[in-house]
Amino acid sequence: GPYTPGTAYILLMRPLSLASSSIGAGHDPRRQYLRGSTGLPIGGMGAVTRAMQKSIEASGGTIRVGAGVKQIAAGMTGIEGVELDNGEFIQATTVASNLHPRTTLVDLLSDPLQEPRFKQNVHQLPQRGSVFKLALALDGVPTFTAAPTGLERAYASCQFRLAPSLDYMERAYDDAKYGRPSEEPIILGLIPSLTSPDMAPEGKHIMSCNVWHAPVELTQGSWKDERGKMASRCIEIISRSMPDLKDRIIDYRALSPLDLEDEFGLRDGNIMHLEMMPSQMFGLRPLADCSAYTTPTTGLYLCGSGTWPGGTVSGIPGHNAAQTILSHIK
């Protein structure tokens, strides 16, 4: 919660980004990569992935999809390759993984030289997430009561945040702390189909919401029972600011933390992989032994949200890891 010591670190990300920016980027929020939400890709977040794919293929690279990794194999001199679920073995001396550090270093890596203590330290990394996902299919754009006349559509195209006070946010966290889904959750939402019309049929829209807090383990009941209840509470809360929302809902889909882990590999539903706290940042992310995108296994690199500077879609972990890999190859 906001009153937990160390959580103010998140507020430092903007000044950190500004201080590390070039002079030309000082007044351009799009080039301050830790600043936070500064724009939307046309086509949704999937457009970012598609652009990366085109860039890789244009440079002669090959992308394999639907190819689950069974094992990252290493020998006495380092990485030897990757074994796929279908039994195929791809030889390689360099592997970069943007999976959760624990998934990479504990579940997938087979290294005869890996120290048991290091493996134990990775296994013990604090990773509990508490996010709940809600997607709404809408018939038209809901009315935003706070939008000035004439600016309704402009306001609707921006991200909305429903967390009216620090006390409200702390209460939402307290519920989860004791194993209960938040009665009055924090909600961050967006209608991406306003800026990317191809995401929905004409006249229809999609609202995407990230919701906090939803503990992985519940003290009572199960997420099978609580998923729909949490979704209904979220819709009620959003409706306070958009009174015609319920009338516009065609359908919805809700994902609990367990769903996010099962479908997307987000361990414990943590979209940041690890805690975004000072104890897990800078040279300690994910551990001091592998804080510079390297690992104790020669040729294995980390490049996901479990490395500095953490989650959100900044591209910085991948960029920094690539620079490290290139410096080792030269």
Please state what every model-predicted region is.
Residues 61-62, 300:
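Short, conserved active-site loop motifs that form the nucleotide-linked donor/cofactor pocket
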Residues 1-59, 266-280:
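Active-site/ligand-binding neighborhood in enzyme catalytic cores
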